[in-house]
Regions:
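Beta-propeller domains
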Residues: 1-14
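Surface-exposed loop and turn segments in beta-propeller and other repeat-based domains
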Residues: 12-23, 70-93, 148-155
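Short loop/turn segments immediately following beta-strands, especially the blade-tip
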Residues: 64-70, 137-141
Length: 155
């Protein structure tokens, strides 16, 4: 997965390498551009072959005048606290989760969604929480605002 300059065909940045394709699901990739097109958030999904567990991740790229620089998000991002019916917790089977970029705010902050999906007694519980990342002048990322977890249940 590459960002390519339209006029020249020059590769501006490689987001995923060919060696990553065994785990990488290109159909689930998302690019979220800032209004000035000087920053882009890249969301991706991968899962090991033959395994239903899905992992989502994101990275951010900033324009430096001649290309894009990758900026990785903080390691300990907020994780949703999935809610289970009273007395029904335990014996959960994880199905994955991770973060997905949603939108750039006018302030230059990035809004993301964090998901955690588990199976419990024949039902799928998905905890979702939104949070905001801010960037300093050197593009160091930090968590700024964390919302509340919403739990969805499906069969």
């Amino acid at each position: 997965m590459e960002l390519i300059e339209k006029d020249s065909g020059k590769v501006m940045i490689t987001l995923h390498r060919a060696s990553d394709t065994e785990l990488f699901d290109a159909s689930e990739s998302i690019l979220v551009w800032s209004a000035d097109s000087k920053s882009v958030a890249y969301g991706f999904q991968d899962s090991p072959p033959g395994v239903r567990v899905v992992e989502r991740g994101a990275l951010v790229c900033f324009w430096n005048g001649s290309g894009f620089d990758k900026v990785f998000l903080p390691e300990n991002l907020p994780v949703p606290e999935t809610k289970f019916p009273k007395g029904k917790g335990g014996y959960e089977k994880p199905y994955g989760g991770g973060v997905k970029p949603l939108r750039w705010l006018k302030s230059g902050e990035l809004e993301l969604s964090s998901e955690d999906e588990v199976m419990l007694r024949g039902k799928t519980y998905t905890g979702v929480l939104q949070f905001t990342i801010s960037f300093d002048a050197q593009h160091h990322a930090s968590v700024k605002k964390v919302g509340k977890t919403k739990t969805e249940v499906s069969k």
